[in-house]
Amino acid sequence: AAELVGRFRNDRRALKSIALTTDTSILTSVGNDYGFDQIFSRQLQALGSPEDILIGISTSGNSRNILNAFKVASDLGITSIALTGKDGGIANKISDYSIVVDSESTARIQEAHILIGHILCEIIEEQLQFV
């Protein structure tokens, strides 16, 4: 989200983007009242609209909080992209698009996810003529 709101390579207009992982008040209140598996889906219900894109990151592809967010995204007509590892898990089956890092190593999967995030930012800037 930071590279989209701020910048990835060059100065440009800010792009609408939010990380659903950063508001500790929301995370703890939703986690306590609804369960940790609802921390992202509840936010998506409040903030999401059909023109949005949800990117969910799960090393295994089976994180319940990510899977629930993908289900809400589908209900709201939001395009979803899963970044996973191993065999892609359930996220690979229920997201609209999936990028699976073919590794069993959590560290390698997470490192690849960082690289993939930067590549996506570069593609977005190039496709939107921001470079």
Question: How should each PLM-predicted stretch be described?
Answer:
Residues A1-F130:
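Glycine-rich phosphate-binding loops that contact phosphosugars or nucleotide phosphates
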